[in-house]
From Swiss-Prot:
Domain tr-type G, residue spans: 4-186
Protein EC: 3.6.5.n1
GO-annotated cellular components: plasma membrane
Family as reported in the entry's similarity comment: Belongs to the TRAFAC class translation factor GTPase superfamily. Classic translation factor GTPase family. LepA subfamily.
Subcellular location: Cell inner membrane
InterPro entries cross-referenced by the UniProt entry: EF-4, EFG_III/V, EFG_V-like, EFTu-like_2, G_TR_CS, LepA_C_sf, LepA_CTD, LepA_IV
Membrane topology: Peripheral membrane protein
Broad enzyme group: hydrolase
NCBIfam families: lepA (TIGR01393), small_GTP (TIGR00231)
The name this protein goes by in its record: Elongation factor 4
A GO term for molecular function: ribosome binding
Alphabetically ordered keywords of this record: Cell inner membrane, Cell membrane, GTP-binding, Hydrolase, Membrane, Nucleotide-binding, Protein biosynthesis
Gene: lepA
Length: 599
């Protein structure tokens, strides 16, 4: 099929605006799957994706559509994730397209991630087509939302297609608009091969499956290929397309989107955004935009039973096959034993990895509080990255600590603006911009990432009754007045409870945390002191009172010296017990850090 009859497009939308349902309808309309094979959210292959109603991995479908002009077009639909944690995947999916459907819920209006992804599309030169979805809802107000799109995003929405993916209204119109407005791919079949990896995942039977967009050249089975970022070489076995079932093809030529299987054993070789070329006739330079995915949030994962350590290593290694952004390395904690320090893209990513470990691999896990990476400049001029607070050098060796700052874009209805501004100020935010668009307000803030990973998202939702939406991107490392807060139980530091906090809130955080720990640590046969310390200074102390056996119960009357002797004996025993006694710290105590709110 010639390039003039090919259209590559993706769908961008905020979570819950009906992106996956619309993809289902388009596949059904073009006859991609029979009635029997059709199921809800057909492109979301993971159970977790369906349950949470989110798309995590990018998927594609090649559809044949007979347009009103009588021609049969091939439409390549690339489904993108909508969540802020997966924004790099979105930018790769969009760079493989010439057009994008901007799906906006006609009852809710424009939200933060819609805008962020739409700007990414415009920067990449992608033709954006607005679609108003869910017009069958009683609360739908398409005219207001069309105005919002023009006002906030700045694209003409007067002819926006009005559709309802649930009932099937407007699906034919969407396909016609795609054919008319999305430009055909421009690629040279005779040039050296250049193919962009949009996504890759691990299949138990064939190894790594790569989803690619061929930009120039032709890719056939038995070709010798090379990845330009990692430099590794492989021999292709199969090439083909998803309809969304996989169908083998004799070749993929310029403008096509399809899959490549080349007997690759690990995902690290096929990184998202890398360029594939031929060994015999290589391209001069790779496609732009590739970057190695950096972990933003770190947390310790420890097995509850220490003999599960190897099982956890296996589970993480298997997950990494399907999730190149997950990084982990072994670490030892005095309090929790052997475990792993894992790096994630964001809190949702961390949540999903944890849930998949528990669900798919039956692991019982203890998770420490999430932290971010700090840049520490030492007195000798060297700079080190610290992702675990317990690894922070001594204060005497530190020149300054720099924390990661993000720029957050928040959309919120005007009646909740006050609450959101108060919240951002509590989190040490600096306001950059504030714009009113109809009833919506757009706020832009610089916020320390450390404050965001704790509980910012939950609080944002609760102060705005769920209406606020958030998108953020990393900005820079900035020096801050930060200190390390240690928790001591029975005069021993518990490394897994250490935190890096701002000096202004450190005393309050220390008191709150000590009080919380007092409630959670079970009572022992001796007094247990819980202390919060900054360096050598103790800033807060709470006591967990001892349980006491009544040793005088057997003395009926009798001499007072007899009673004193028994009490002294008990006292000496308690003193001895305190010296050798171990205090078991329950899992809830490690999560208590998350619940310590700011003032």
């Amino acid at each position: 099929m010639s390039q003039t009859l090919t259209r590559n497009f993706s769908i961008i939308a905020h979570i819950d605006h009906g992106k996956s349902t619309l993809a289902d309808r388009l596949i059904q309309f073009c006859g991609g799957l029979s009635e029997r094979e059709m199921e809800a959210q057909v492109l979301d292959s993971m159970d977790l994706e369906k349950e949470r109603g989110i798309t995590i991995k990018a998927q594609t479908a090649a559809l044949a559509y007979k347009a009103q002009d009588g021609q049969i077009y091939r439409l390549n639909l690339i489904d993108t994730p909508g969540h802020v944690d997966f924004s790099y995947e979105v930018s790769r999916s969009l760079s493989a397209c010439e057009g994008a459907l901007l799906v906006v819920d006609a009852s809710q209006g424009v939200e933060a991630q819609t805008v962020a992804n739409c700007y990414t599309a415009i920067d990449l030169g992608v033709e954006v087509i607005p679609v108003l979805n869910k017009i069958d809802l009683p609360a739908a107000d398409p005219d207001r939302v069309a105005e919002e799109i023009e006002d906030i995003v700045g694209i003409d929405a007067t002819d926006a297609v009005r559709a309802s993916a649930k009932t099937g209204i407007g699906i034919a119109e969407i396909l016609e608009v795609v054919v008319k407005q999305v430009p055909p791919p421009r690629g040279d079949e005779n040039a050296p091969l250049k193919a962009l990896i949009i996504d890759s995942w691990f299949d138990n039977y064939v190894g790594v499956v790569m989803l690619v967009r061929v930009v120039d050249g032709v890719l056939r089975p038995k070709d010798k290929i090379r990845f330009m970022a990692s430099g590794t070489q492989y021999l292709t076995e199969h090439v083909g397309v998803f309809t969304p079932k996989s169908v083998d093809r004799p070749q993929l030529s310029a403008g096509d989107v399809g899959f490549v299987i080349a007997g690759i054993k690990e995902l690290k070789s096929a990184q998202v955004g890398d360029t594939v070329t031929l060994v015999d006739n290589p391209a001069g330079e790779p496609l732009p935009g590739f970057k190695k995915v950096q972990s933003q949030v770190f947390a310790g994962l420890y097995p509850v039973e220490s003999h599960d350590f190897e099982a956890l290593r296996d589970a993480l290694t298997k997950l990494q096959l399907n999730d190149a952004a997950l990084q982990f390395e072994p670490e030892v904690s005095q309090a929790l034993g052997f475990g792993f320090r894992c790096g994630f893209l964001g809190l949702l990513h961390m949540d999903i990895v944890q849930e998949r470990l528990e669900r798919e691999y039956d692991m019982d896990l203890i998770t420490t509080a999430p932290t971010v990476v700090y840049e520490v400049v030492q007195k000798d001029g060297t700079t080190i990255n610290v992702e675990n607070p317990s690894k922070l050098p001594e204060l005497s060796k530190i020149e300054e600590i720099r924390e990661p700052i993000i720029t957050a874009t928040i959309f919120v209805p005007e009646e909740y603006v006050g609450n959101v501004i108060t919240l951002c100020n509590q989190k040490r935010g600096v306001q950059l911009d504030m714009q009113y668009h109809g009833k919506q307000v757009m706020l832009r803030y610089d916020l320390p990432m450390n404050e965001v990973v704790m509980d910012f998202f939950d609080k944002l939702k609760s102060t705005s009754r769920g209406y606020a939406s958030l998108d953020y991107e990393f900005k820079e490392f900035r020096a801050g007045d930060l200190v390390k807060l240690d928790i001591l139980v029975n005069s021993e530091k518990v490394d897994a409870l250490s935190l890096i906090v701002h000096r202004a809130t450190s005393v309050y955080r220390g008191r709150e945390l000590a009080a919380k720990m007092r409630e959670l640590i079970p009572r022992q046969m001796f007094d247990v002191a819980v202390q919060a310390a900054i360096g050598a200074n103790i800033i807060a102390r709470e006591n967990v009172k001892a349980m006491r056996k009544n040793v005088l119960a057997k003395c009926y009357g009798g001499d007072i010296t007899r009673k004193k002797k028994l009490l002294e004996k008990q006292k000496a025993g308690k003193r001895r017990m305190k010296q050798v006694g171990n205090v078991e710290i329950p899992q809830e105590a490690f999560l208590a850090i998350l619940q310590v709110s700011d003032k």
